[in-house]
Amino acid sequence: MAIHADTHDDLRLFQTGEHACGYWSDRQARDLVLDPHDPRLGALYPQALAWGFRRSGDLVYRPHCERCRACVPVRIAVDAFHPDRSQRRCLARNQDLVVRVVAAERTEEQLALYRQYLQHRHPGGGMDTHGAAEFDQFLIGGWSHGRFLEIREPAVDHVPGRLLAVAVTDVTEHALSAVYTFYAPDAAARSLGTFAILEQIQWARRERRAHLYLGYWIEGHAKMNYKRRFNALEAYDGRHWRGLPAAQGSAR
């Protein structure tokens, strides 16, 4: 099938076959995928984000399930965001950490943390065997304009501290997109997932980017609840982005 992309060309969309849902074990899923061979893909990606799509490797996709519409694209309106009490505590708890934005180029230290995270979060699921090739394919891709937000413990004697988290982030003219975040399992008390989003918001604000895309939110799914705790959250209904009230709860 095809949708109109501009006044001259059509952008082709492909529909995948059904596959196991990554969120509900008793459901099947399928996706719409932008033509991965379209040479305009990098240029079209910012608009695709605004249409509710997301990047995984070189693929730009959106859930398109036959009997389920649970996956809702969400983003934060950066200038309107203000951290709540729980998020302020998260920032205070992590004020000793060193945060920097680096090139999206894999290091052995990042790969080791990625594998540690997957082995802890997804044991036996296939992802826990990922190596360097899968890291590059899944997180970096061939055409995206991405950066890594690194979070580290403080340096000691001018030696960089231990790497605690990496937030893979796509950069477009008007927005950032949170692609994937992985962090040290033994640092769970720091709520590094929430801290990474708070730092991405600050990054977007510094560079005058209007939105931070958070991917998909699923109402009632425990692993997705943290996204509702951010105020200035907007959801895409297939035609328009509309504001959502923030839910209350502790930072993950």
Swiss-Prot record:
Signal peptide: none annotated. It is an enzyme of class 2 (transferase). GO terms for biological process: proteasomal protein catabolic process; ubiquitin-dependent protein catabolic process via the N-end rule pathway. Keywords: Acyltransferase, Cytoplasm, Transferase. The keyword Acyltransferase applies. It catalyses: N-terminal L-glutamyl-[protein] + L-leucyl-tRNA(Leu) = N-terminal L-leucyl-L-glutamyl-[protein] + tRNA(Leu) + H(+); N-terminal L-aspartyl-[protein] + L-leucyl-tRNA(Leu) = N-terminal L-leucyl-L-aspartyl-[protein] + tRNA(Leu) + H(+). It comes from the Bacteria. GO terms for cellular component: cytoplasm. One of its GO terms (molecular function) is arginyl-tRNA--protein transferase activity. Its EC number is 2.3.2.29. It is found in: Cytoplasm. Functions in the N-end rule pathway of protein degradation where it conjugates Leu from its aminoacyl-tRNA to the N-termini of proteins containing an N-terminal aspartate or glutamate. Belongs to the R-transferase family. Bpt subfamily. NCBIfam families: PRK01305.1-1, PRK01305.1-3, PRK01305.2-3. PANTHER family: ARGININE-TRNA-PROTEIN TRANSFERASE 1, ARGINYL-TRNA--PROTEIN TRANSFERASE 1. This is Aspartate/glutamate leucyltransferase. It comes from Xanthomonas campestris pv. campestris (strain ATCC 33913 / DSM 3586 / NCPPB 528 / LMG 568 / P 25).
